[in-house]
Structures are given as C-alpha cells and as structure tokens.
C-alpha cells in the first residue's frame, strides 16, 4: 500500500525556501500541524520559587501525600511576542526583584519601557494563538491555577559535581576481593579493538552529574493558598530549595483543566 505523502511537508518548505518559492501552508488536518498545536499550551507559564516539601493526608484513601510548595514572588508579564512582528506568539514573564545597576542598558530599557522594576528571573513562554497573550504589567497570582488541575514543571536538578560511573550511571563495579586490584569502581571496557579504533558516542563514563534541565509532567495541583501566595503540587520537583521553576499547563489534553 502506497504512503499518503511521498514527501514530508518539512522537506517541501525547505526546498521552497532555498529555491525562493512560496512554501505550501501546513494543512489543518496534517499530522505535523496537529503535533504543533498539541505541544504549545493555550496560556503562558509562570516562574515560581520552590520553597520545600511537606505532606498531607488523602481523606479518601488514608494515604500520606508528598507535596511541594511553590511560591509566587512578584510574577509579572513583561512583554509579548506576536506572529506579525516576531513570527510566533509568546509572553515574556519575570519574577523576583533585581537591582537596576546589575543589568545591562538594553535590559533596563525593556523593563522601564513598560514601567516594570527589573526582575531576577525572566523567561519566554510560547502560547498557541493570540488569545493567550497577556498585556505587559499584568501580575500573576494564585488565582492563575485551580485545585485538581494538572501542570508541567521544569527545573534545574541539583548539581552533584564530578561523579564516577557507579554513582552516575549505577554500574555494579568490579569485585571487592578475589584478585581485584585498583579496579573496584572502574567502568571496565569502553569499546572494541582496532575496529572501530575509537570510543563510540554515547558511552557512559564518569563526568559531571546533575545540574540538568528536567521536566516533570502531569503533576496535580493539590491546593492553592492565596494568603501565603503559594500552591501545593503533588510529588517532587527537580532543583534545590529557593530555586526558580517554570510551571505551565500540561499539554496532555485529557488531564488539563484549561486545554
């Protein structure tokens, strides 16, 4: 049975770009268009501060539930990106506070042009269309999230420094005795012989462990506390306490309260 598409839409647009031709628009029913729509949330995300963990008891099951505390720290919309001017829709969001003398003149102009005090953390969040844009200066509060909705949280994991293969990758190591000498925690063989005469890419070795961007998806918002300006999210989140994390509506349509 022949395939429906002999050439992918991406290749068609690439060839059209180099040949100075008008590229064919992505049809609404193509898998590529559906994938692009699914990967971008309707609303922009926010930058929150991880304060630590606590627990609660589920009244229905009687089980203890681990919760992570995420606090709003002067989260505010700074600028917007439009498809007409920039080629995509996005909202620039900032949180915290920073001294003006510690940032560049260009950054100062970006903040002061919207009458916003400089922020410690700044990040762009893509949105699906113009309906998700937020006017600059808008302050995000705990009302932005509702209990029982699901979110995706991205953070920087804790740095562990230089680690060996046993700690970094879970290698079993060599024998503790019976002839083993100076090779108890070594990685062992790292490749073949004359062929291919090199170490293949992706080989697990010792190196820097941690301090990587990781995303935890489909976390349940357990509760919202407007007085303390924080939300409680079920489960753990990467990163140390007092670190900034990026919270967005989950892209999973079946579990999102807004999609």
UniProtKB/Swiss-Prot annotation:
GO terms for molecular function: structural constituent of ribosome. Residues 176-197 have a biased composition (Polar residues). Its main location: cytoplasm. Pfam families: Ribosomal_L3. Residues 176-208 are annotated as: Disordered. The keyword ATP-binding does not apply. Residues 1-15 form a transit peptide. GO terms for cellular component: cytoplasm; mitochondrial large ribosomal subunit. Keywords: Cytoplasm, Mitochondrion, Ribonucleoprotein, Ribosomal protein, Transit peptide. GO terms for biological process: mitochondrial translation. It is found in: Cytoplasm; Mitochondrion. Component of the mitochondrial large ribosomal subunit (mt-LSU). Mature yeast 74S mitochondrial ribosomes consist of a small (37S) and a large (54S) subunit. The 37S small subunit contains a 15S ribosomal RNA (15S mt-rRNA) and at least 32 different proteins. The 54S large subunit contains a 21S rRNA (21S mt-rRNA) and at least 45 different proteins. Component of the mitochondrial ribosome (mitoribosome), a dedicated translation machinery responsible for the synthesis of mitochondrial genome-encoded proteins, including at least some of the essential transmembrane subunits of the mitochondrial respiratory chain. The mitoribosomes are attached to the mitochondrial inner membrane and translation products are cotranslationally integrated into the membrane. Belongs to the universal ribosomal protein uL3 family. This is Large ribosomal subunit protein uL3m. It comes from Schizosaccharomyces pombe (strain 972 / ATCC 24843) (Fission yeast). The gene is mrpl9.
């Amino acid at each position: 049975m022949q395939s429906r598409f002999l050439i992918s839409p991406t290749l068609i647009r690439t060839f059209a770009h180099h040949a100075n031709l008008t590229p064919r628009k992505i049809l609404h029913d193509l898998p590529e268009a559906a994938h692009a729509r699914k990967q971008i949330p309707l609303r922009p995300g926010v930058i929150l501060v991880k304060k630590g963990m606590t627990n609660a008891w589920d009244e229905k099951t009687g089980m203890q539930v681990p919760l992570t505390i995420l606090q709003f720290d002067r989260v505010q919309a700074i600028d917007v990106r439009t498809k007409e001017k920039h080629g995509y829709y996005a909202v620039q969001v900032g949180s915290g506070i920073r001294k003006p003398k510690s940032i560049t003149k260009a950054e100062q102009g970006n903040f002061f042009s919207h009458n916003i005090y400089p922020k410690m953390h700044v990040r762009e969040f893509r949105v699906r269309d113009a309906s998700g844009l937020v006017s600059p200066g808008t302050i995000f509060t705990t009302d932005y999230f509702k209990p029982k909705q699901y979110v995706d949280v991205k953070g920087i994991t804790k740095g562990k420094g230089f680690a060996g293969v046993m700690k970094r990758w879970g290698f079993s190591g060599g024998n503790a005795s019976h002839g083993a000498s100076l090779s108890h925690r070594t990685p062992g063989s790292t490749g073949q012989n004359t062929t291919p005469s090199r170490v293949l890419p992706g080989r697990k070795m010792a190196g820097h462990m941690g301090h990587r961007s990781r995303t935890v998806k489909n976390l349940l918002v357990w509760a919202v506390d407007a007085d303390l300006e924080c939300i409680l999210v079920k489960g753990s989140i990467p990163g140390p306490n007092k670190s900034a994390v990026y919270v967005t509506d989950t892209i999973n349509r079946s579990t999102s309260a807004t999609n």
